[in-house]
Amino acid sequence: MRRKEKRLLQAVALVLAALVLLPNVGLWALYRERQPDGTPGGSGAAVAPAAGQGSHSRQKKTFFLGDGQKLKDWHDKEAIRRDAQRVGNGEQGRPYPMTDAERVDQAYRENGFNIYVSDKISLNRSLPDIRHPNCNSKRYLETLPNTSIIIPFHNEGWSSLLRTVHSVLNRSPPELVAEIVLVDDFSDREHLKKPLEDYMALFPSVRILRTKKREGLIRTRMLGASVATGDVITFLDSHCEANVNWLPPLLDRIARNRKTIVCPMIDVIDHDDFRYETQAGDAMRGAFDWEMYYKRIPIPPELQKADPSDPFESPVMAGGLFAVDRKWFWELGGYDPGLEIWGGEQYEISFKVWMCGGRMEDIPCSRVGHIYRKYVPYKVPAGVSLARNLKRVAEVWMDEYAEYIYQRRPEYRHLSAGDVAVQKKLRSSLNCKSFKWFMTKIAWDLPKFYPPVEPPAAAWGEIRNVGTGLCADTKHGALGSPLRLEGCVRGRGEAAWNNMQVFTFTWREDIRPGDPQHTKKFCFDAISHTSPVTLYDCHSMKGNQLWKYRKDKTLYHPVSGSCMDCSESDHRIFMNTCNPSSLTQQWLFEHTNSTVLEKFNRN
């Protein structure tokens, strides 16, 4: 080869190499080279970068789908590394070490969670990455729609609201966030007025809207959605923390199918010490019982994916945290404007999207923490009823299945739902399917856990101890209270059953206070072979709440391998090593169904 040609080839090779190796530096915001926020344990306010400012750590590898669509890794590896190095109060989602002085009721009174603790944790605190390990290697579409993030609030705590905003800014690719819209539902706390305006002026992507009167959560969300400019609307609550790479997995599913509503996995931020952890059972399908309480049920084997980090269908959303294509949201009519304050809206939007041509998914690789309040700290305006909202949803969407609700809540039957003609017309114009279709094709696994027609109970009435002649009694105990042994009121000839001594051994193989038609929502629960028997929220998942009533009259607890026993001297009811000859371990139900009991024991 001649020298001139050789030099030319070398020059071309150098140019090509330079093009390959040239860093792809995007206009990414600095993660948190921040000014101090004045809170212990962390750096402060997120600050918008100067134009053109970027980070070499944001460089991404690009992959390709078979149809030519580009995929890329959206993780901010440098930000993740910095988060891993953070130490201080609440960092890595660890519990704040509370003192007795910080546990006082005053700390919870205004917000329903401990605002003293919240104020001592950095607004930019780090969170544990509790996603499935497969999420680390997932790639999403390189070109994704942007989103308006709508955060409604009413008298929210300062640090909890700001931490919500900071977590979104810190853990979202800036080009995917069209705006963050804070919608103030007529708050009257001073820190949410000019101080909030001044603080949020630091962030060009954040704006604040304010209602002129108390509208409630539902209509406040609608106000935010009405001014949104993003391709997608993402709703969050005002006391959340977005976790690592939470946004691209949501937007990717909508980019592939605009009629998909997507929900992040909702983790729990403890209302006392702000520890961050998964919900019990983690990935589960959203459901409801026939009193319209939200429930979670296991993913059935038929729907389980080979990769547990893949999205999965869910019949019903939890409510406050989801993303939806903006145009699709309005094609569906948004929320029913006749729904008041809050409650029932998650059912309305869930039924609507499934029955009217869309779908809904939970996204395991998108996680957002949420503070579940100890109690609701504000009053619902006079005349507003959650029951009315539920009746309205039932009348518009549930067809003949509404009757199952009215059977359990007879007070709903004659309650006015207001004028639903417009909503029924919307349903007709969208050519929506029937609720029977929804129950048959989408929520087909729900009746296994919450059947419309309650199967017969195995036993009910008083539970009398053979050895002592005394009865199990709740003593009007609150959740978590131990069951007690007391004199049997039926034996004293009282005219009516004492509600504290009436129990039902249900078809779920749990034992609940109340007669078969009116059972309560808490169950006999035991955690070990020596523990007291306590009343705990019924979860319908067996486990600690599974009981067997055997032919020898013992109440056997399979998880602990022990039997329910009692002590007459101190009125305790507790678990003990099974001894069929012990009369204090033998119990008599007032009424039994031998067919059901035989089935239980056979299983």
Curated annotation (Swiss-Prot):
Residues reported to bind Mn(2+): D237, H239, H370
Gene Ontology MF annotations: carbohydrate binding; metal ion binding; polypeptide N-acetylgalactosaminyltransferase activity
Residue positions binding substrate: H154, E156, D185, R214, S238, W342, R373, Y378
Residue ranges annotated for the Ricin B-type lectin domain, each copy included: 458-590
Region Catalytic subdomain B, annotated ranges: 311-373
Membrane topology: Single-pass type II membrane protein
Keywords: Disulfide bond, Glycoprotein, Glycosyltransferase, Golgi apparatus, Lectin, Manganese, Membrane, Metal-binding, Signal-anchor, Transferase, Transmembrane, Transmembrane helix
Pathway: Protein modification; protein glycosylation
Family annotation (InterPro entries): GalNAc-T, Glyco_trans_2-like, Nucleotide-diphossugar_trans, Ricin_B-like_lectins, Ricin_B_lectin
UniProt note on tissues of expression: Widely expressed. Expressed at high level in small intestine, and at intermediate levels in stomach, pancreas, ovary, thyroid gland and spleen. Weakly expressed in other tissues.
Residues carrying covalently attached carbohydrate according to the record: N124, N146, N593
Pfam families named among the record's database cross-references: Glycos_transf_2 (PF00535), Ricin_B_lectin (PF00652)
UniProt feature, compositional bias: Low complexity: 45-55
Membrane-side (Lumenal) residue stretches: 32-603
SMART domains: RICIN
Residue ranges, Cytoplasmic side: 1-11
Cofactor(s) listed in the protein's UniProt record: Mn(2+)
Main location group: Golgi
Top EC group: transferase
Signal peptide positions on this chain: none
UniProt subcellular location: Golgi apparatus membrane
Disulphide bonds in the chain: C135-C365, C356-C432, C471-C488, C523-C538, C563-C578
Swiss-Prot/TrEMBL catalytic activity: L-seryl-[protein] + UDP-N-acetyl-alpha-D-galactosamine = a 3-O-[N-acetyl-alpha-D-galactosaminyl]-L-seryl-[protein] + UDP + H(+); L-threonyl-[protein] + UDP-N-acetyl-alpha-D-galactosamine = a 3-O-[N-acetyl-alpha-D-galactosaminyl]-L-threonyl-[protein] + UDP + H(+)
Annotated region (Catalytic subdomain A), positions in chain: 144-253
Entry protein name: Polypeptide N-acetylgalactosaminyltransferase 10
Organism: Homo sapiens (Human)
